[in-house]
Amino acid sequence: MTVAESTCALVSTQPSIGKPTGGIATYSPAYTIVPTYECFNRCTYCNFRTDPGESSWMSLSAAEDIFKRLQNEQVCEILILSGEVHPNSPKRQVWFQRIYDLCKLALTLGFLPHTNAGPLSFAEMQELKSVNVSMGLMLEQLTPKLLETVHRHAPSKLPELRLQQLEWAGELQIPFTTGLLLGIGETNDDCWETLEAISKLHQRYHHIQEVILQPHSPGNQQTFNAPAFNPHQLPEVIAKARQILPSDITIQIPPNLVKDERWLLACVEAGARDLGGIGPKDEVNPDYPHLQAEELREILQPAGWDLMPRLPVYPQFDGWLSGELQASVRRWRELVIGNW
């Protein structure tokens, strides 16, 4: 029985929202930079990748133009989201250097970088720590059976490889975001086991900021022939995740993948108190435009929820950052708290 099937029996056809409890939901004012869409993985649900040579790489000059324009807008996070170059490829070092240079440029121009570029070597993670306030990598699902289906042609989706990234992030004291992709063939137990693995690592290193619960949402590029994960089933999954995960890990959902306002509120009520990075475009789900902050406030405020901006690093992790990064974070905290 899949998560979709087993959860369906637990969730009614209407969201269970009683008297609003109210509180704070957060989001990160963000802009996504894609160094390259090129990727050696071929996940069948992907709507992001291109084949090598099909698209140009982001140049530093093009990125600088974007960053300078963004200096006049309320954007604090630069998400460096990249397709993956094979670790043994002769282009790997050039690829990594481009990512590092983009992070450094963003930092120099006043932004807070967060990188998600697939599995990295320990040395690569260590180097990127100096120019990122946080980093991330989705676990998606740890069950090895997906290596026979949606991840059949995706070498970097080996469960042990991705878990190793979370462990290295803990050893390096890198504030980290991870998450699950729901509705790609996993069972209910698979889902809970992935959450339990995250919980176990966090209890050892105390480094996980957020866990994203992302419903599979079909797009125009994918070859995976399966329906969307029903967002009406998300509240129960969120509630279970809240039971499994330590209380200092924030649960995040992408609001553009939960179109029904009532169900979005139900997700927040169930324990998803962060709505992720909000920017002009969702690069991973390009067929699903982001809801902007004002639209989200119109949904949340009548139910008693205040939507507040946050930085891509949570305050309890500031001490893990270098002096330079701490100074940038301190400036942003004063700005966000004082004016936004």
From Swiss-Prot:
Domain Radical SAM core residues, every copy: 25-256
Cofactor requirement: [4Fe-4S] cluster
Record has S-adenosyl-L-methionine as a keyword: yes
Catalytic activity: 5-amino-5-(4-hydroxybenzyl)-6-(D-ribitylimino)-5,6-dihydrouracil + S-adenosyl-L-methionine = 7,8-didemethyl-8-hydroxy-5-deazariboflavin + 5'-deoxyadenosine + L-methionine + NH4(+) + H(+)
Annotated TM spans: none
InterPro entries cross-referenced by the UniProt entry: Aldolase_TIM, CofG_family, Elp3/MiaA/NifB-like_rSAM, F420, rSAM
Disulfide bonds: none
Residues annotated for [4Fe-4S] cluster binding in this entry: C39, C43, C46
Keywords annotated in UniProt: 4Fe-4S, Iron, Iron-sulfur, Lyase, Metal-binding, S-adenosyl-L-methionine
Cofactor: binding details: Binds 1 [4Fe-4S] cluster. The cluster is coordinated with 3 cysteines and an exchangeable S-adenosyl-L-methionine.
PROSITE patterns in alphabetical order: RADICAL_SAM
Pfam families on file: Radical_SAM
GO molecular function terms noted in the UniProt entry: 4 iron, 4 sulfur cluster binding; 7,8-didemethyl-8-hydroxy-5-deazariboflavin synthase activity; iron ion binding; transferase activity, transferring alkyl or aryl (other than methyl) groups
Pathway the protein contributes to: Cofactor biosynthesis; coenzyme F0 biosynthesis
Entry similarity comment: Belongs to the radical SAM superfamily. CofG family.
Subunit field text: Consists of two subunits, CofG and CofH.
NCBIfam families according to UniProt: F420_cofG, PRK06245.1
HAMAP family (alphabetical): FO_synth_sub1 (MF_01611)
Protein name: 7,8-didemethyl-8-hydroxy-5-deazariboflavin synthase
Organism taxonomic ancestry: Bacteria, Bacillati, Cyanobacteriota, Cyanophyceae, Nostocales
